[in-house]
């Protein structure tokens, strides 16, 4: 984990004698939007919260299920813009940092944790597999990533995709961990999500503007249509990170990236998105602070008390929104204070 003064892409390029490359602020905005989604989903106030902010029980797709794939895709988008992404030491240090930080967060929430689980452990596993994929020649990268999805489909056909028995349950048990949406069985599919982000990052790096917008939009639409066409055979399932889930959520993320790139980077509409940009730049701080303070510390004491009082005064629906909205506001204030001081925390 590194704490460093904030620097623009132009400053960093100048420091190494490269032509300045403008920062694509739309990417930070999309990351920030994903962070807001995670905070709203993780810190929901009570059962009166809309169903779309609850994950699908098993098969199916809700807004809550799209949030994390968007975040993972943005992780991949950043790779082509990083001078250190290819370096083994830098990549492995990042993976280790994410895994350790994830272990600490899960331990703070539940009192114990297994290495490699939790949201940050999931990011670490997906990033590692994607980084290994990127060691291959570029044509082989695409072929291999495309081959992962049919492979996952075959596993589902052989071992099943039921809530009590699936190939994911079997793999996690063999690895000695409990089945969960963030357990190791989800790493291959989510690595493909990260790789889709890498491809999008290459498109943006090769030249932002109309051509990039067309490619991102066409690619996103094609993924959504293909994924939906597969759902009668391969159901949408976040907990298994099924092939159809990879395609549909990856397509949605690409379409969102195209829209924000057009608005923020091409049209220059920045001010309305500045709050999201702050959370996108300080994403690690936002997530860890929320998990520790609002999930580990306050959720068992303060949150129930506030929920009961607000429910009695304004009703359950108002109380359901108070806690998640308050968590976003407080987390944003912390991130904004750090950014004003030029402090950016990255892993």
Model-derived segments and their meaning:
Residues 1-347:
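Alpha-helical transmembrane segments and their immediate juxtamembrane cytosolic regions
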């Amino acid at each position: 984990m590194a704490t460093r003064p904030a620097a623009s892409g132009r400053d960093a390029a100048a420091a190494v004698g490269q032509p300045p490359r403008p920062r694509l602020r739309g990417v930070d905005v999309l990351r920030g939007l994903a962070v807001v989604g995670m905070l709203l989903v993780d810190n929901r106030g009570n059962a009166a919260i809309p169903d779309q902010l609850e994950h699908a029980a098993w098969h199916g797709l809700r807004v809550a299920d799209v949030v994390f794939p968007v975040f993972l895709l943005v992780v991949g988008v950043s790779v082509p813009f990083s001078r250190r992404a290819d370096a083994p030491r830098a990549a492995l240090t990042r993976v280790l940092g994410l895994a350790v930080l994830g272990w600490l967060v899960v331990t703070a929430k539940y009192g114990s944790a297994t290495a490699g689980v939790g949201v940050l452990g999931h990011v670490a596993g997906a990033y590692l597999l994607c980084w290994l994929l990127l060691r291959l020649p570029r044509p082989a990268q695409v072929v291999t990533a495309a081959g992962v999805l049919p492979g996952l489909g075959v596993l589902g056909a052989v071992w099943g995709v039921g809530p009590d028995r699936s190939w994911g349950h079997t793999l996690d048990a063999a690895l000695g961990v409990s089945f969960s949406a963030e357990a190791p069985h989800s790493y291959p599919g989510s690595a493909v999500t990260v790789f889709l982000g890498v491809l999008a990052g290459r498109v943006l790096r090769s030249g932002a503007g109309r051509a990039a917008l067309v490619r991102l939009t066409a690619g996103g639409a094609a993924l959504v249509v293909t994924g939906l066409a597969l759902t009668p055979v391969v159901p949408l399932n976040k907990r298994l990170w099924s092939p159809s889930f990879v395609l549909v959520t990856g397509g949605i993320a690409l379409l969102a990236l195209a829209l924000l790139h057009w608005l923020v980077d091409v049209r220059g509409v920045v001010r309305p998105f500045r709050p999201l940009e702050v959370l996108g730049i300080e994403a690690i701080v936002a997530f860890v602070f929320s998990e520790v303070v609002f999930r580990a510390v306050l959720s068992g004491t303060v949150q129930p008390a506030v929920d009961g009082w607000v429910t009695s005064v304004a009703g359950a629906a108002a109380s359901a929104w108070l806690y998640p909205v308050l968590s976003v506001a407080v987390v944003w204030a912390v991130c904004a204070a750090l950014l004003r001081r030029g402090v950016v925390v990255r892993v």
